[in-house]
Amino acid sequence: SPLKMALGKDVAGKAVAADLTAMPHLLIAGTTGSGKSVCINDILACFLLNMTPDELRLVLVDPKRVELTGYNGIPHLLSPVIVDAEHVVGALEWMMREMDSRYRKFSETHTRNIADYNRLCEKTSEKKLPYLVVVVDELADLMMLAPDETERTITRLAQLARATGIHLILATQRPSTDILTGLIKANFPARIAFAVASSVDSRVILDHPGAERLLGRGDMLFQAPDAPAPVRIQTAFVSDVEINRLATYWRGFTVTHLAPERPDQPAAFQTKKGVPLKQAPLWEEMEEEKDLDPKFDEAIDIVRSEGQASISMLQRKMRIGYTRAARIIDKMEEKGIVSEPDPKTQIRDILKTDESKAE
């Protein structure tokens, strides 16, 4: 199997391995210090020990800037390790375009999946397609920044990308329903649960309790997509020294065959012109002299329909941050649309109900 990975040992002391191509995507969750990042390093080490850059390409996302940056410079990477959450949606968009491109190639050659296509390439001496694996070390950061785009791209890739050799590994330390939505979970039948704080968190990950009784430090429950119940495993430990040795070994090689349209510039994975990387521009990042917030008219509609206005209400209704909601409310007060806040409740009355919105 091309994407075989060692998970650790079960309670009987037998080694446990899994195949990412059969999963075909993996969801990992657990509290801080439970062993998520160690497990990811374990999986990546297995890939790097068994596959060349011609066979496998990686996209690594590490918002914490600690766990995966040690892999920078290895020829398997399509771009340097992504540490800015703003670029991740663009990376997922690039993956979707690559998926569509591969499906077109399959259609032209009358093949069904990447294995059939690569076998055909062996006969015709054409260039094979590498497997593409996206590893996200913290999903919560993306879901807070751009929940709609993140969920949409992850779901589409999870549903369609399997046959094209594109696989996802997502990890989070916040196993809550707003991060691991029903749509995401439905497309990730293979899951790993490390130690969590409560049975509620365990149910979010595995759909039943048990992970709250794990010991931590690599103690995990692995739910295979074809297994009726999860298996308890102690994950393998790959030290930083071993990771550095592995990365240093691969840095000594040059890449002879690049993945199609390799995006290896600093502005990697940019979406099409005019398409923002984030769900909406952060108002606090805009210049003061620019026009009104793009959502100002929408905010006026909301406060008029509610009959009152408050910062917390705009946060809930519009799914925006406190700073942006506060600026919108201040601008409404400046234009005479809402009153000053009530000293006790901080709720504002609507002063203008029938005047035109901001032009």
Stretch-by-stretch model annotation:
Residues 36:
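Conserved lysine of the Walker
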Residues 31-33, 172:
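The conserved Walker
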